[in-house]
Amino acid sequence: MDKIPCTVSILTRNSATTLARCLESVKEFSDVLISDGGSTDATLEIARRFGARVIRQDPRFLSGEGRIEDYAAVRDQALGEAKEAWFFFLDSDEYVSTELVAEIRCITSSKPAGVFILYRKYVLQDGRVVDCSTTYPNPSMRLFARAAVKGFRKRIHEVIVPKEGVVPQSVKGDLYVPLDGDIEFWRTKRDRYIALEVKRLTSGTRAFWPLIIKVLFRHAAISAHYALRHIRILLFCRGVKMPFAHEIERHRYHLRLVVALWRARHECSTS
């Protein structure tokens, strides 16, 4: 069977524990591009074993420790290195369902240039797929024709920007997000996002009080929305539920972001 005419872009940094699973799920794609941030484990060896191309993340978009500070810029860098007209991006700890692979094959071979929304599902460490989570249906624009987009935006939680007049469509099949590691792993990961978000929010000349009030109300509303969804899940979900510790972490993220922003203002005023 012919390869799927689509570039798959994967960000890596010491991703040896999850990369093989990810690459195995996209082995039917014609162009697999690894954007690496200076891995020192077996990441690059695994990439070569699967025949993936490797580029180094531009140091302009990284911190002094080599971690990404501008995800949109790193994604744009990979987009510029793509060989195919279609582009699909994911993280090294994610993997693709066979149904989604078949759907992407159909889209890239028969559909006009467009942008497509995929749906992510969490997978527990015992292999069970989570049926009910407060973030479901968890949509994400991950597949697109390069001619249909402007590029990426947002330094964290990056998103692709379609060109004017391009209406995103939905895709069948799931993108799996394993809940590997303990809760501290996810807490550390989110704390990094908090630090980047605070840096972004405080880098301009906006007045502090309107900023923190806006952030406080926005994240309080999001947290309340998740809480209501969680109550509904507890009452009506008969399938596999997202672990409670992970649901609580979402509320912790929003609270810690506001606290970190307040502390950043205090540090600036006393320095």
Explain the meaning of each model-derived region:
Residues 94:
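Aromatic, loop-rich ligand-recognition surfaces of beta-strand-rich domains
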Residues 31, 53, 165-167:
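Conserved beta-strand segments of alpha/beta enzyme cores
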Residues 2-7:
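Extreme N-terminal starter segment of soluble prokaryotic enzymes
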Residues 87:
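Short aromatic/hydrophobic "clamp" motif used to bind/position activated sugar donors
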Residues 10-28, 33:
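Short, well-formed alpha-helical segments that are part of the catalytic scaffolds
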Residues 25, 36-46, 50, 59-60, ...:
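A conserved acidic beta->alpha catalytic loop
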Residues 72-79, 98-267:
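Catalytic-site signature of metal-activated, phosphate-bearing donor transferases
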Residues 49-83:
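Active-site-proximal specificity loops/subdomain of glycosyltransferases
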